[in-house]
Amino acid sequence: MTRAIMETDKGTIHLELFDQDAPNTVKNFVDLAGKGFYDGLAFHRVIPNFMIQGGCPNTRPGEQGMPGTGGPGYKIKCEINPNKHESGTLSMAHAGRDTGGSQFFICHSPQPHLDGVHTVFGKTADMDVVNAIRQNDRILSVKIEA
């Protein structure tokens, strides 16, 4: 199982990535992390008791676009799988089926209405850090461990 270490303003989030259940989504996340794509981006959407969302390049200092509307310049297909949106679930954000790219979210609590809609591709147990993150806190780096 591939693991990612996400350093944030509020601490470290260790992520287990679901290579078997969402191989293309995991590969995309790993590739973007390897290029430093996520480094310095903000969590642009934080809804208490729901989720934190990041991965929009428009949150990089000096960018002009509206936060929450950016991506890597391409879209990936959804990989809906049996994993549920529970506390600590890492899932792909999108603006409609097969429109994801770089934005992701981590759930604060179970969100069953998202099951079968968004691609679950990982999980964290570091809920103290997830719960401490506020809007505009930053991702410092994402490192991948095979």
Which ranges hold each PLM region?
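Cyclophilin-like peptidyl-prolyl cis-trans isomerases
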Residues: 1-146
